[in-house]
Amino acid sequence: MKKTLLLLFAIAFFAHLHAQDSAYVRQIIKDLSSKEMYGRFASYHGDSIAAAYLAGEMKRLGVLPLQVDYFQNYTYNCYSLEGNISLKINGVELEPYTQYRVYPTARHATPSKLNKASWKKQLKDGTWLIGVSQLDTYSPWVVDKERTDPICIEILETALPKKVKKVVADIPIQYRDNYLTRNVVGYVPGVVDTMIVFTAHYDHCGIMGDNVLFPGAHDNASGTAAVMDIARIVSQSQPYYTMVFMLFSGEECGLRGSKYAAENPLVDFNKVKLLCNIDMFCGGDEGLMVFNANSTETKPYFEQLKAINEKSHAALNLRPRDNSPNSDHFWFSNYCPSIFILTMGQPYGGYHDPNDTCEGCGLGHYNDYLKMILQLAGIEQ
């Protein structure tokens, strides 16, 4: 009985330590995925609210600004959808997101897609309504030219009556020309000026009207929180390598923030030992995946990570993948060794949907996985 009590106490004690270790990360995820951030895209300038929050946190930690006020500004053309949205068919109000989704881009109203639609109707203002068996994954809206595309509203076939007599749509989309957004950038000077760069995107999908929020906790408040946690750790004592932290906007609409940062560099890429991008870092029951792990420049780092894992047994699997334009490491891989690490498996709330909440983010593997990354970067705790 005494041994059992000691064992239970030890389990409870280490669980408490684990919870304490991830408390900072949990708070960052909670703050970034809150309704006050408006999904961290253009609607109500949610991305700017998030950027100001992250810059303030860097300053509080003692991370130095890589640019004035920690901001690297750039622009793009985009849409936002603020206010109440409404779609009534035959007098019946449909439920936004679950029964219909709004897309103001041409790819959702292509001739091919219109031909495949089980039902379609074009309103007087050019808006297309199409019936589909499954709604597309939601993404934010960015365009490279002035708005010319019709709005497309996808409606679940199960939400459509047998005969559509009347459609009333109130979808107040706003087009924003040269919308100002920003990357958040800082650094902690090391003993040497050789750099390790940690990156993540802090943006997400915004809102689809005032009643549909995309919190983006797993994607990618979690990766942003991990980068901030590394900043917190290295700011407590001078690291050997100079540590650079770049948090990007515009990832969800085509890796725009990281592309701008790569093409308008704030650091000398010749001095970058490794760039490590972290995207979707909750869950992880199935291990870790590493993109761009097989190139001549990056394979030694993957082998090092594999050796670390063989000692710690932290990750059930460690899967190498070739390079891919699927996250913010991609543009930098032309200039310096760059990898992208993400978790595999549950638990997390959802993907590009309202269920991707802080409450759904599992951090049970977080400490072990972070230690692997810290060891890879030569950071001792």
Where are these regions (language model features)?
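Noncatalytic luminal/extracellular "stalk/propeptide" segments of secretory-pathway proteins
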Residues: 38-128
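Bacterial Sec-dependent N-terminal signal peptides
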Residues: 1-22
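N-terminal capping segment at the start of a domain
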Residues: 21-49, 61, 65-66, 86-87, ...
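Second-shell loop/turn segments in exported
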Residues: 35-45, 73-75, 172-174, 210-220, ...
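Metal-dependent peptidase/peptidase-like ectodomains
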Residues: 248-347
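Short helix-loop-beta-strand segments that form the rim/entrance of peptidase-like active sites
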Residues: 231-256
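Soluble metallo-hydrolase cores and metallopeptidase-like ectodomains found primarily
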Residues: 93-94, 103-109, 135-216, 232, ...
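His/Asp/Glu-rich mid-to-C-terminal helical/loop segments that flank catalytic regions of hydrolases
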Residues: 232, 349-381
